[in-house]
From Swiss-Prot:
Binds 1 zinc ion per subunit. InterPro entries: CPB_M14_CPD, M14A-like_propep, M14A_act_pep, Peptidase_M14. The active site is at residue 378. Zn(2+) binds at residues 176, 179, 304. This is Mast cell carboxypeptidase A. The lineage of its organism: Eukaryota, Metazoa, Chordata, Craniata, Vertebrata. Coiled coil: none annotated. The gene is CPA3. Residues 16-109 form a propeptide. It is an enzyme of class 3 (hydrolase).
Length: 417
């Protein structure tokens, strides 16, 4: 018997169907001069290119490695245009949907147990925060700092002395929804900090003398959307006035030279800055929390992916901050320490000259607020998998990054008052 569905139900079902990326490709192109850079920009005007690196069309420049996603329908035309203009390129990913499915390459060892070797959805992360509080009641507390536009809670885990105000490090993960290895690291950090306290000399010393504030998922609505509807989603899920396009790039929404970089005012662009500084509920919740704990917080660290970099201010100007030498020293040693585990090589430097100019970033905002040690990690890899780092790479990524974070914490403990 044929089942006839009401038209409205069919429409709703189609509307919420997850986006598929069958036979979509990711190209890597290195324009040799400004003319070739302009060719890429022109292609972006007539084709729907999703820029993975750099984060937007206007950042494309000569001698920069440029990664972008192309639909199956447009990939042949793009390839032909690159060939005609004698541009060097490689195809990093031949079938994006296939890579998305291959990303889950670790089997769940014990069903129901929180896995640090797998990517976890928001529901599992919330349950995990409760579990960590129950398991370590003297060391872990959960603070609701606000809620999202879709009314999901924003939780910060405080690791350390529950009732004492001491030096602290604030860390956030998952400000961009599709960068899944970032929230995986925040979970790993909490797990290792609590598990090794009393056993690992360095971690014990750190937790005896300082607190850590961990925001495991900054962009909760976007993260949920990337799990359920569109794996490539980047922004949050707020509605934009006078536009059908959804979302703001939360890392362009901070009050740090907010409107100084052009081409961030299009609500349909992935790097849309929002209608005003701190216009987004997530941004406001984080800035309010950090302001209220400013006397404690000595370090701000934010985790992104991908490209293997350790960045520090500024993004909105080529001017170097007053303590540039100190920041560069910490970043250099941090990347050296990170490489001792698996010989993974990171580069380091100011955002503006190391990656590309950006305005409205959380890193610059925290620095200008008075937190003089602010860093952004761009985690693995360098582009082979991009945002689709396989689960089998989560633990190695977290282990090596943990070494760098512990070094930064030790340095701050010793060198700040």
């Amino acid at each position: 018997m044929r089942l006839i569905l009401p038209v409205g139900l069919i429409a709703t079902t189609l509307a919420i169907a997850p986006v598929r990326f069958d036979r979509e490709k990711v190209f890597r192109v290195k324009p040799q001069d400004e003319k070739q850079a302009d060719i890429i920009k022109d292609l972006a005007k007539t084709n729907e290119l999703d820029f993975w690196y750099p984060g937007a069309t206007h950042h494309v420049a000569a001698n920069m490695m440029v990664d972008f996603r192309v639909s199956e329908k447009e990939s042949q035309a793009i390839q032909s245009a690159l060939d005609q203009n004698k541009m060097h390129y490689e195809i990093l990913i031949h079938d994006l949907q296939e890579e998305i499915e291959k990303q889950f390459d670790v089997k769940e060892d014990i069903p129901g147990r929180h896995s640090y070797a797998k990517y976890n959805n928001w529901e599992k992360i919330v349950a995990w925060t409760e579990k960590m509080m129950d398991k370590y009641p003297e060391m872990v507390s959960r603070i609701k700092i606000g809620s999202t536009v879709e009314d999901n809670p924003l939780y910060v885990l405080k690791i350390g002395e529950k009732n004492e105000r001491r030096k602290a490090i604030f860390t956030d993960c998952g400000i961009h929804a599709r960068e899944w290895v970032s929230p995986a690291f925040c979970q790993w950090f909490v797990y290792q900090a609590t598990k090794t306290y009393g056993r690992n000399k360095i971690m014990t010393k750190l937790l005896d003398r300082m607190n850590f504030y961990i925001l495991p998922v900054f962009n909760v609505d976007g993260y949920i959307w990337s799990w359920t509807k569109n794996r490539m989603w980047r922004k949050n899920r707020s509605k934009n006035q006078n536009s059908k396009c959804i979302g703001t790039d939360l890392n362009r929404n901070f009050n740090a030279s907010w409107n100084s970089i052009p081409n961030t005012n299009d609500p349909c662009a992935d790097n849309y800055r929002g209608s005003a500084p701190e216009s987004e509920k997530e941004t406001k919740a984080v800035t309010n929390f950090i302001r209220s704990h400013l006397n404690e917080i000595k370090v701000y660290i934010t985790f992104h992916s991908y490209s293997q970099m350790l960045l520090f201010p500024y993004g909105y100007t080529s001017k170097l901050p007053p303590n540039h030498e100190d920041l560069a020293k910490v970043a250099k040693i941090g990347t050296d320490v990170l490489s001792t585990r698996y010989e993974t090589r990171y580069i380091y430097g100011p955002i503006e000259s190391t990656i590309y100019p950006i305005s409205g970033s959380s890193l610059d905002w925290a620095y200008d607020l008075g937190i003089k040690h602010t860093f952004a990690f761009e985690l693995r890899d360098k582009g082979k998998f991009g945002f689709l780092l396989p689960e089998s790479r989560i633990k190695p990524t977290c282990r090596e990054t943990m070494l760098a974070v512990k070094f930064i914490a030790k340095y701050i403990l010793k060198h700040t008052s």
